[in-house]
Regions:
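Lipid interaction determinants
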Residues: 9-19, 83-86, 130, 134
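Small-polar-interrupted transmembrane alpha-helices in polytopic inner-membrane proteins
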Residues: 22-33, 84-103, 119
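Hydrophobic, aromatic-rich alpha-helical transmembrane segments
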Residues: 52-57, 80, 84, 107, ...
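Membrane-interfacial alpha-helical segments at the cytosolic side of multi-pass membrane proteins
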Residues: 61-77, 85, 120-136
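Internal alpha-helical transmembrane segments of multi-pass membrane proteins
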Residues: 76-89, 143
C-alpha cells in the first residue's frame, strides 16, 4: 500500500502536467467515442475527423498521443524499456476494447482498419519512447 502512495506522490510531484495531459486526452477520446455511439452531437466528432484527414488518421493520432503521454506519466517510476511496453500495451488494450464495443452499437461499425490505424499510432509512439528511454539510460551511465 505504501508503494502505491509513493508512486502517486512521485507522479503528482514530478509529472503533474503529463498526468493532466494524459487524463484530458483519455477523457476526450472516450467522450468522442461515446458521442459517436450515441449520435448525440456527433457532428463535432465528424468535423474533427475531417480536420485531421479522416477516421483512421484520428485513430492513429489519438493512439500516438495517448501512448506518448502515458509513457511520460509512467516513466517517473522506471524509465526503462519495460514502461514502453506497458504504456503501449495499455493503450492497445483500450483501443481494442473500444473498437470491440462498436460492434454492439447500432450507429457504429466494427473496423479492422481502425484497429490497424490505432496499432500503427501505438507502434510509432513506442519507437519514439524507446529512443527516449535509450537516450536517458545512456545519459545516466555517462554521468
Amino acid at each position: 500500500m505504501y508503494i502505491r502512495f509513493k508512486i502517486g506522490r512521485q507522479i503528482y510531484q514530478q509529472r503533474l502536467a503529463s498526468a493532466i495531459l494524459f487524463g484530458l486526452l483519455a477523457l476526450s477520446t472516450v467522450l468522442a467515442s461515446w458521442l459517436k455511439s450515441s449520435g448525440f452531437h456527433a457532428d463535432y466528432v465528424y468535423q474533427l475527423e475531417l480536420a485531421v484527414g479522416g477516421d483512421t488518421h484520428l485513430h492513429s493520432l489519438l493512439a500516438f498521443l495517448l501512448t506518448l503521454a502515458l509513457y511520460r506519466v509512467l516513466s517517473v517510476t522506471e524509465s526503462g524499456y519495460n514502461m514502453v511496453l506497458v504504456a503501449g500495451g495499455l493503450v492497445t488494450l483500450c483501443c481494442l476494447v473500444d473498437e470491440g464495443l462498436q460492434a454492439f452499437s447500432p450507429l457504429r461499425t466494427f473496423s479492422v482498419q481502425d484497429i490497424l490505424a490505432s496499432l500503427i499510432g501505438v507502434a510509432v509512439a513506442c519507437a519514439v519512447n524507446t529512443l527516449l528511454a535509450g537516450r536517458r539510460q545512456r545519459k545516466r551511465r555517462n554521468t
